[in-house]
């Protein structure tokens, strides 16, 4: 097929296999050597036939809650590991390091409605995790508007097609694309970050994703997945070249979207409509809150409100 396609369209990029929401590698029947990984066998086949260069991108869907549902708040703790586990499985089973990979469709659909801020936290954590893992891009599903205000559509509309309110994931996207990363059409440098904010069970309650933006500012996206408590944290940047830590200095912009900026009020249901659900309204439904922090070295504390996405943006000093 690649040969025939390229005969007609020489520059057509070819890739796949568009895995659908798989939580791990995809197995097939075992071959004579006992190898069951479809990914491994697929790349071995291309390599043995001298066609690996025809394969220019690896694609997959990501729906961590599609089969099992994620009604419990604690399911948020799993998302970075969900991402890292499946991508590492593909790398371990033959995904060539030079082939870019893309999440071409995905969401937290089983709990992605307007009635909770949880899907916003999931989206921010997911995007930070998958880009840190090396993805070439990620694509949101779905943008189609919905007339059911409690459903998973990106924007709810009325009968005349007018937007009636803003969903948590819409507002989270505004924070990610307008506050964390800017300008979105220029290259950013993404650095791995770690957090030691954990609960008694060992769950990481706060995750962090650090960008060096084209304008020279450091922009740290933090997701406080603690539903009940705020946290105050210090932030340090490891300067490997100088062999020391550096810290925010001067004015740091702080943008927050979370439980205080989005509150859902369900409509009362008549007894005859017990199965309906979903109807209601959000008040407030954004915008994200803004403030500044005066940073002065290692001891500076940054407040992270409960159940929130936080962007801290500023410059680091030489202290």
Q: Where do the PLM segments sit?
A:
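Structured core elements
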Residues: 59, 103, 139, 219-222, ...
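Short, charged beta-turn/beta-strand-edge "cap" motif at the junction between a beta-strand
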Residues: 316-319
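Generic recognition of flexible, low-complexity loop/linker segments
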Residues: 45-47, 89-92, 125-128, 143, ...
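Aromatic/acidic polysaccharide-binding cleft in carbohydrate-active enzymes
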Residues: 103-207, 214-215
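Histidine- and/or cysteine-centered catalytic micro-motif in compact active-site loops
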Residues: 63, 106, 143-144, 223-226, ...
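Carbohydrate-binding surface patches
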Residues: 199-245, 252, 256-261, 308-313
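Noncatalytic carbohydrate-binding groove/subsite architecture in carbohydrate-active enzymes
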Residues: 1-126, 133
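Acidic, Ser/Thr/Pro-rich beta/coil linker or hinge segments at domain junctions
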Residues: 243-304
């Amino acid at each position: 097929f690649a040969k025939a396609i390229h005969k007609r369209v020489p520059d057509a990029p070819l890739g796949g296999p568009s895995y659908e929401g798989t939580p791990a590698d995809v197995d097939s029947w075992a071959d004579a050597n006992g190898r069951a990984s479809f990914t491994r066998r697929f790349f071995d086949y291309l390599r043995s036939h001298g066609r690996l260069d025809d394969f220019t991108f690896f694609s997959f869907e990501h729906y961590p809650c599609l089969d099992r549902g994620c009604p419990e708040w604690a399911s948020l703790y799993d998302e970075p590991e969900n991402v890292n586990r499946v991508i590492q499985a593909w790398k371990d089973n033959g995904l060539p390091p030079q082939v870019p990979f893309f999440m071409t469709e995905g969401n937290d659909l089983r709990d992605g409605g307007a009635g909770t801020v949880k899907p916003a936290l999931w989206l921010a954590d997911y995007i930070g995790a998958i880009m840190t893992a090396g993805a070439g891009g990620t694509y949101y599903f779905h943008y189609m508007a919905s007339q059911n205000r409690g459903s998973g559509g990106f924007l709810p509309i009325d009968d005349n097609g007018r937007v009636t309110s803003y969903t948590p994931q819409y507002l989270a996207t505004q924070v990610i694309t307008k506050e964390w990363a800017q300008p979105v059409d220029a290259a950013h440098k993404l650095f791995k970050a770690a957090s030691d904010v954990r609960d008694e069970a060992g769950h990481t309650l706060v995750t962090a994703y650090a960008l060096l933006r084209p304008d020279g500012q450091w922009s740290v996206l933090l997701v406080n997945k603690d539903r009940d408590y705020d946290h105050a944290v210090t932030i340090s940047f490891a300067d490997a070249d100088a062999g020391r830590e550096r810290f925010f200095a001067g004015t740091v912009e702080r943008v927050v979207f979370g439980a205080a900026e989005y509150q859902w009020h369900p409509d009362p249901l008549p007894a005859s409509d017990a199965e309906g659900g979903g109807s209601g309204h959000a008040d407030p439904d954004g915008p994200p809150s803004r403030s500044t922090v005066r940073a002065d070295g290692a001891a500076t504390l940054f407040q992270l409100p409960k159940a929130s996405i936080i962007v801290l943006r500023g410059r680091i000093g030489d202290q």
